[in-house]
């Protein structure tokens, strides 16, 4: 499981999933919910891509840890969904705040974007988690077992 190939595949799958998901979802939130201009949102997404590349695999490891805890707490499917939301919100919100500060968003825009992102994450539930699981299967991450709570 810890061979260089499987770690590389795991990192690439996690990176692909995070860059695609965060680019699409956060741009929609920034423009339509938080009132950022298209230019501000594009700047934010351009800053976010290298950040997402750096944090994607650590996030995947963090999520897997949260999933193991959730699996021990309850085998129910809702536990996986709740764990996905918790992992995403607690890991991504601080990173998102820093990105928005970097591109010059004001505190009102930051609060709107981050709170909207939290609400959207809760409403979409485990969409990112399912997408991440799909990407891991797509990239044939060796010895990967779909995270089930």
Curated annotation (Swiss-Prot):
Q: Where in the cell is it found?
A: Cell inner membrane
Q: Where are the transmembrane segments?
A: 16-36, 46-66, 85-105, 112-132
Q: Which UniProt keywords apply?
A: Amino-acid transport, Cell inner membrane, Cell membrane, Membrane, Transmembrane, Transmembrane helix, Transport
Give a GO molecular function annotation for the protein: L-amino acid efflux transmembrane transporter activity
What are the GO cellular component annotations? plasma membrane
List the Pfam families hit by this protein, alphabetically: AlaE (PF06610)
Task: Show the InterPro entries listed in the entry.
Answer: Ala_export_AlaE
How is it placed in the membrane, per its record?
A: Multi-pass membrane protein
Instruction: Specify whether Transmembrane is a keyword of the entry.
Output: yes
One GO biological process term: amino acid export across plasma membrane
Superkingdom per UniProt: Bacteria
Tell me which family the UniProt entry assigns to this protein: Belongs to the AlaE exporter family.
Q: What does this protein do?
A: Exports L-alanine.
Q: What is this protein called?
A: L-alanine exporter AlaE
Species:
Salmonella arizonae (strain ATCC BAA-731 / CDC346-86 / RSK2980)
Gene name, Swiss-Prot/TrEMBL: alaE
């Amino acid at each position: 499981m810890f061979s260089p190939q499987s770690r590389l595949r795991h990192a690439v799958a996690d990176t692909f999933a995070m860059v695609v998901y965060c680019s699409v979802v956060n741009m929609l939130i920034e423009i339509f919910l938080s009132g950022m201009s298209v230019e501000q949102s594009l700047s934010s997404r351009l800053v976010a891509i290298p950040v997402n590349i750096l944090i994607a695999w650590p996030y995947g490891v963090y999520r897997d840890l949260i999933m193991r805890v959730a699996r021990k707490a309850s085998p129910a499917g809702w536990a996986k969904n709740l764990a996905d939301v918790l992992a995403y919100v607690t890991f991504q919100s601080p990173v998102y705040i820093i990105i928005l500060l970097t591109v010059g968003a004001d505190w009102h825009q930051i609060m709107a974007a981050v709170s909207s992102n939290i609400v959207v994450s809760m409403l979409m539930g485990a969409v990112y988690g399912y997408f991440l699981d799909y990407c891991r299967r797509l990239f044939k991450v060796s010895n990967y077992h779909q995270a089930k709570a």
